[in-house]
Amino acid sequence: MAKLIEAPKGQVGRPSRSFTLDQTRALLDAAAASPLNAYVVLSLTTGIRTEEARVLRWDHVDLDGKPDADPPVPPSVAVWRSARQGGETKTPKSRRTSALPRTAVQALREHQKRQEEDRPAAGALWQDHGLVFCSTVGTPLDAANVRREFRKITEAAGLGEGWAPRDLRHAFVSLMSAGGVPVEEIARLAGHNRTATTELVYRHELRPVITTGAEVMDRILDSPMQ
């Protein structure tokens, strides 16, 4: 299992890890029963940072696209904000709009439906922030609670301990690279300023070349197990 360090300067970080394809499938199966399912699927299939996912709003998610346009516009997610101090994404180039794979569209539709069904139960306590991922009363998710729920999923998947939500981003890079996506395209999908960042931080997960994002993720996850 590849291990690499992704930590702010001057701080000691836990080595990040990447899921294998078999582990990814086990994770997705286990996540299906979790309220965090759409969070896991979106993070894994788009590479969105965990601090970006926690503040993602529904008005930045297009689950329909424009299939009749010329050329057709696929369903997409616009990543413009982050839970970082100041609310901005990590860098200006971190602002990006990424196509959504079919598995992410399905998970988000189901999540949106459940959220709409559960909202009346909160009654007057509901706070409408328009968040895709929120508490039972509409408030932003706490990072510690996300980590706790995610670890329940990895344990249910038989993956053991020590995993964190940010490992989903490493898995995204690994799956994209294994699918033949060039490092330049992976850097753009991941919201990196330059390929050097991708190559440094995710160096053990990168492989040589060819193709693009949502289509590759659909092909990888839809392919039969060996």
Where are these regions (language model features)?
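Alpha-solenoid repeat scaffolds
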Residues: 34, 208-209
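C-terminal secondary-structure termini that scaffold catalytic or DNA-interacting sites
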Residues: 4-7, 18, 63-69, 73-76, ...
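A short, basic/aromatic helix-end/turn motif that makes direct DNA contacts
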Residues: 55-61, 187-193, 203
